[in-house]
Amino acid sequence: LAAVSVDCSEYPKPECTAEERPICGSDNKTYGNKCNFCNAVVESNGTLTLRNFGKC
């Protein structure tokens, strides 16, 4: 099974679009899109990881 990841190197960003591209985080929370997810990853100091693309 290949590990999936998201490149969050350009984050955090002050504002995210309302684009709907759900990402499920390791905290079992569904983030609306990559921007929302990556901002949360930065806030978590890297402890939050990607579980899967799509809703949890």
UniProtKB/Swiss-Prot annotation:
InterPro entries with a match to the protein in the record: Kazal-type_SerProtInhib, Kazal_dom, Kazal_dom_sf, Prot_inh_Kazal-m
Disulphide connectivity of cysteines: 8-38, 16-35, 24-56
Glycosylation sites: 45
Coiled coil regions, renumbered to chain: none
Gene Ontology cellular-component annotations: extracellular region
UniProt keyword Disulfide bond present: yes
Glycoprotein in keyword set: yes
Cellular location(s): Secreted
GO molecular function, one term: serine-type endopeptidase inhibitor activity
Protein's recorded name: Ovomucoid
Protein species of origin: Bambusicola thoracicus (Chinese bamboo-partridge)
